Amino acid sequence: MANPVVAIVGRPNVGKSTIFNRIVGERISIVEDVPGVTRDRIYSSAEWLNHSFYLIDTGGIDIGDEPLLVQIRQQAEIAIDEADVIIFMTNGRDGVTAADEEVAKLLRRSNKPVVLAVNKIDNPEMRDLIYDFYALGFGEPYPISGAHGTGLGDLLDAVARHFPKDHGQEYEEDVIKFCLIGRPNVGKSSLVNAILGEERVIVSDIAGTTRDAVDTSFVREGQKYVIIDTAGMRKRGKIYESTEKYSVLRALRAIERSDVVLVVLNAEEGIIEQDKKIAGYAHEAGRGVILVVNKWDAVEKDDKTMVEFERKIRDHFPFLDYAPILFVSAKTKQRLHKLLPLVQLVSDNHAMRVQTNVLNEVIMDAVAMNPTPTHNGRRLKIYYMTQVAVKPPTFVAFVNDPELMHFSYERFLENRIRDAFGFEGTPIKIIARPRK
């Protein structure tokens, strides 16, 4: 199920980013240090009580040279489009401004739940400032202080009351769910249409979330598939074109609901920084990943072109060295027949389990070949390893001291596991724990 999305909307200088940071706390930092992966701070996952959700900070958009009201309108329209619930942020010290009223007009037309927050109410004596904000027409204003963090609990309680009871469509265990992500104009929509165009049995279009995302179900050679959020792939609005950061959020929600993620690259344009960011989202989410190079028909090539392009991909995506690469053309259907079998292989690997006794034979052989590291005269001892989860495959190594497990040795063990069992297309997690 996809987590709901909460957007913080308001004119500049009302404290959106401060409240964003208050709510997400430490969560904005990258959990694992992966080379080449950066996280855009315009959104983050957050939790309140037992509710997980995504939080958007519209204050994260660069103002640039655009007129102020145009920028405000863009912020609000983007949030309206993506959010399940909107926090309308105002500044109690300034009172209701013309810009606040402009935002309110847009939000009233949205039919989305809106919770009104009045920021900078830094002490009880200032509480009377909130009453003017009833005039905006969104019911009770919630007084908060970004500086002190007060009032956020009541605000988030009000937000959580609007969360959808059902976040999305549930599918049977034997259905492989995959999505296509990539920057604009890499050919995601064309690939979706090319995949579906070859199908003889399209089962249904199922509304996949609370809004306009559509999941397309189909069957190929007895295997059930769902392409997650095909509506999102086909939708192109002026707002998204001008603020591409926000298309990230739609990709995140699709990734969250998928088993396998197809990261689509444009062979004509090569690889840019945005491609690396987008691919990083799939890796960080622990999904199976396939790198799909589209528009391969449009590239002038010789017998070395594919090898050289593949080397560039490996150089740019060192954190995805486990992901297979497929060169295709949605236009000419080149190699498209290989795509779904590869999706199925990666999905199977993503859910693969290995027997503990066989796993430990591999680990002991690895240690014999490359002895464990030492630190300050102490040597790492690996007593045994076991697989504790799938999707992605996750292994726990019981050791004498987890601090002695250097990341380079962990990587060595991962490579030995891959050599023994495959796991093509899926990340692997290894966790060192002390033996009790």
UniProtKB/Swiss-Prot annotation:
All residue ranges annotated as the KH-like domain in the record: 352-436
Organism of provenance: Geobacillus thermodenitrificans (strain NG80-2)
Domain of life of the source: Bacteria
Gene that specifies this protein: der
Sample GO molecular function, one term: ribosome binding
Positions of the EngA-type G domain: 4-167, 176-351
Binding site for GTP 2: 182-189, 229-233, 294-297
Secretion signal span: none
Subunit structure as annotated in this protein's UniProt entry: Associates with the 50S ribosomal subunit.
Classification via SUPFAM superfamilies: P-loop containing nucleoside triphosphate hydrolases
UniProt-recorded name of the protein: GTPase Der
